[in-house]
């Protein structure tokens, strides 16, 4: 196959989206944008990106940020392990590299939360290094371009695609080339629905287009079934109209984040909820059920039963705090898993 770079780059320079991390592609900006975009659409991530940079304009500021403020800046993006790893990496960068990301692929790859793709994006876009940056968009483009039925989630297949990506990469324009492939996959060689082949600069070279197999590609491994977990969520409110929050364990699902009272296992009845509250030293003065809800994580689905409970005046149990509505809005971060109950909390 002839080299795709000339046609691809010509298309990219004419059609690329104007994005803040492209107009000012400092290593920190590219790093932050790539972490945010791992599980979030560009349009949804942009307001968070701007707000985050306004509060934490450089790596030392990120490294020094208090945990609650950091979580609050990330609130709404989900997958909070991303921002925890972001801060862990920032602290290492401050300790070992003077607060500036290293211009070295392997050194970037060694930082928490930075994998092959993110290291390649930073290294090529910000530092001009001739390295690959292969994400799902790029794998899809090359799967169709070569009409390759390989399962792209398999490591050996991904390595083979990466080698093909590098065969076409112009070393002096590595960052632009990598971004162009990502952009082509995002705007033209799209994942859902028919690809926009008539707009593609590589249409004349695309083997899947000739074979009529573009809609069938790429091939992925079948996803694992999610585990269903019933949980009971309790919005406990005291006489001062404060809500009880408990902090989750520092490891595992939603690590270290705040949540309403929650019990895992079979859905609890109102009587069982009151009994558990009394065991915590909280008197159940009134209780009413809330609508059932669910939340899907990558590997777990919560089926939530909810109750709103008035408990009068009481000390917060161990591991819990009372939080006013104002504090809930400005200080504490509740994960998106509790979206169905946020209106009741005044959020």
Tell where the protein language model's regions lie, with residue ranges.
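Catalytic cores of DNA base-excision repair glycosylases
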Residues: 2-198, 202-211, 215, 283, ...
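Intrinsically disordered, low-complexity, charged terminal extensions of DNA damage-control enzymes
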Residues: 1-18, 23, 186-347
